[in-house]
Amino acid sequence: LENNNWWRLITPIFIHFSLSHLAFNALWIFVLGSKIEMLDGRFLFISLVIFTGIASNYIQHLWNGVSLFGGLSGVVYGLFGYCYLIELDLKQERYGLPPAIYIFMLVWLILGFLGILELFGFGSIANHAHLGGLISGLIFGMLTKLYSKKNI
């Protein structure tokens, strides 16, 4: 990042461009975050937010270069990726998310990349941050599983 402005990797999660943008992200952080924090601990939740926030913003920056973007959507996708991976081989739901929610988020991601959301007035969307968040959440989930198995 230009001139060693490393903080730009995390500060976009504090910027939102509309009240609905903030409300949508806050809702998912509350719903998913409270479940992850309760079941997996506060330290893991905070680490997950920081990891997915930095990763999603870095991917967005790599893909689009210097541009103005913000929001917690990359982190939200990271939380979904984490929950999905942790639940993948469990016999029962851990976080209580119905499969339709995961499908909805994937469809939303695809619609974003296709430009359909912008056509319907959702504004410019940091699609690569969403994808980066999803991938980094999956990675965090894999690392969490590996670490948990080694320490049992």
Mark where each language-model region is.
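A detector for small-residue-rich transmembrane helices and their helix-helix packing motifs
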Residues: L1-I152
